Amino acid sequence: LAGASSAVAQASDAERFWGQWRGPDATGVARFGNPPTEWSETRNIRWKVEIPGRGSASPIVWGDKLFLLTAVPVGEPQPVATADAGQQAPAGRGRGGRRGRRAIPMHRFIVMAIDRETGEIAWERVAREEVPHEGHQQPNGTYASGSAVTDGDHLFAFFGPWGLYAYDMEAMGQ
């Protein structure tokens, strides 16, 4: 046990935290983790929080925060313009192709930080607000699919065609 504690104390932050998709070694394994082997709605659950919108990115962990990305629809769906002449796409059954593209609501592309101990939202920042130009999503797809990444000083969030955003961790209160 003393050897394990010593190894954790000597590990760098990059080794101790989950700063990228699939963790420090990109293997999905937390070498210094001690996760529960059993859980349910009431057992080994510290907190549970509802996240607005949809995001399929893997959360990352650094220090006392968990970071995640989400895309939140806001307002009413907007007609989608066609690529040629900027005209409104013809009405259709929704999935694109010759019948037209479905209308899509404005989305807020959000970076969130959640306190690891309490589950409270520490902060959230709207990276961008825009109507997505991709009208088609797979059933499990989202507009926030790429995982954030951090080097401990900066947090990087990639929202595909909506941009790459860099945040100063110190300025964000990390």
Regions found by a protein language model. Give the residues of each.
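Bacterial N-terminal signal peptides
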Residues: 1-6
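Noncatalytic, solvent-exposed loop/strand surfaces
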Residues: 7-174
